[in-house]
Amino acid sequence: ALAVQPGLAAPVPVPDPRPLLTMEDMAHGDHGSHGAGKGMEGGCGAMMAEGGCGAAMHGAHAGHGAAKPVVHPASEAGNPLVDMQSSPTGPRLDDPGVGLRGNGRRVLTYADLRSLFDDPDGRDPGREVELHLTGHMEKFAWSFNGIPFASAEPLRLNYGERLRVVLVNDTMMHHPIHLHGLWSDLEDADGAFQVRKHTIDMPPGTRRSYRVRADALGRWAYHCHLLYHMEGGMMREVRVEERA
């Protein structure tokens, strides 16, 4: 036992009941939307395939984290590397996770994290990029927007810009998403700055957003930190470039 001095021992606590992983835990209680090629590409078209509509943003982004219908990128439609899509999603920042709910103990979650400093940048994001975490479990294929790394164009950021990244997890697995070189400023359910991170955990079926300041020129890796998912294609190159 871990103790303050040799010879001390504490009683072994009774283990929690073995949790059951259900379809609901994987955000597919209705079995998800199988068959991504059923006309679900939505209105952003090819622009969504390369990282979102990129529309200009104005003012506060209140209510951004609330559950809402999902618009899937066109690159997911009819894609043999995408075996399911999420239904309405939300951030679920206060969810402890499988086996940790309702056990009589307090479990820390993202909702408990609060930065000791204000938003380090202070600007509203000038544009928004939405990326879907996608895959095909039987083929062990992983990707962003249904496009594996080998086939994907870089995500291009203008040096000095502030943007919002929205991630939607269409899969039944967790994906901790890490952007090299730049900070990820997680937003709360109302779209306000909450805490600075360098990896954003994405449970199944969640939609979470964070702000990025493109303040480091260069070519940066952007990937799932489950490295076998990265090797399977869930990776992009991010290029921070001087404005033309």
List each language-model region with its residue ranges.
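Short beta-strand/loop motifs in extracellular/secreted proteins, especially
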Residues: 173-177
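Beta-strand secondary-structure signal
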Residues: 130, 164-166, 209-211
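Acidic helix/loop microenvironments that form the catalytic cleft of cell-wall polysaccharide enzymes
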Residues: 180, 226
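Asparagine-centered strand-capping/turn motif at beta-strand->loop junctions
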Residues: 167-171
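Extended terminal and domain-junction accessory segments
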Residues: 1-162, 215-219, 227-244
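Extracytoplasmic beta-sandwich strand-turn segments characteristic of Greek-key/jelly-roll folds
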Residues: 151-156, 181-217, 244
